[in-house]
Amino acid sequence: MQFQRDVPSLWLWRSLSLLLLLGLGFSQTPSYRDAVLRAVDDFNQQSLDTNLYRLLDLDPEPQGDEDPDTPKSVRFRVKETVCGKAERQLPEQCAFKEQGVVKQCMGAVTLNPAADSFDISCNEPGAQPFRFKKISRLAGLLRKGGEKIGEKLKKIGQKIKNFFQKLVPQPE
């Protein structure tokens, strides 16, 4: 009889221990959203705008590597709030500004707060980020270079054709 009473309490004790351990494990693993919120805070600190920006929406977390030190690609939008930077208020406590600026952000974050690695660029929709402008300029240069090489090859081909035509005897 004593054994039967101890089994449920043993089961309860193990279940509570397991839940406690799982809770500790989850509380130490930072979330994707938390990493993005840290990136938004970093954006607010670096931004030259006078008002704070707040997370508007966030694309779902990409599946893959579970290592919190591995950078994860992110894509989200922020919107200007009514709070000025000088007020030193948390963006989450600020209302969105009517007709506030919305910026599309993309880049990479690490989930580990100790590493706190962000590579984020935010721009208004329709505006190209600086690094994309560099790539488009490079593409233009490559296209022009390819056209010049094509023209040179065409001239070389014509010279070769002319050379062989001169070797063929002409009928008199």
From Swiss-Prot:
Belongs to the cathelicidin family. Residues 1-27 form the signal peptide. The keyword Signal applies. Expressed in granulocytes (at protein level). High expression in bone marrow and small intestine. Expressed in testis, spleen, stomach, and intestine. Very low expression found in heart, lung and skeletal muscle. No expression in brain, kidney or liver. Residues 28-134 are annotated as: Cathelin-like domain (CLD). Keywords: Antibiotic, Antimicrobial, Disulfide bond, Immunity, Innate immunity, Secreted, Signal. Antimicrobial protein that is an integral component of the innate immune system. Binds to bacterial lipopolysaccharides (LPS). It is found in: Secreted; Vesicle. Disulfide bonds join C83-C94, C105-C122. Proteolytically cleaved by cathepsin CTSG. It comes from Mus musculus. This is Cathelicidin antimicrobial peptide. GO terms for biological process: amyloid fibril formation; antibacterial humoral response; antimicrobial humoral immune response mediated by antimicrobial peptide; cellular response to interleukin-1; cellular response to interleukin-6; cellular response to lipopolysaccharide; cellular response to peptidoglycan; cellular response to tumor necrosis factor. Residues 28-134 form a propeptide. One of its GO terms (cellular component) is cell projection. It comes from the Eukaryota. Pfam families: CAP18_C, Cathelicidins. The lineage of its organism: Eukaryota, Metazoa, Chordata, Craniata, Vertebrata.
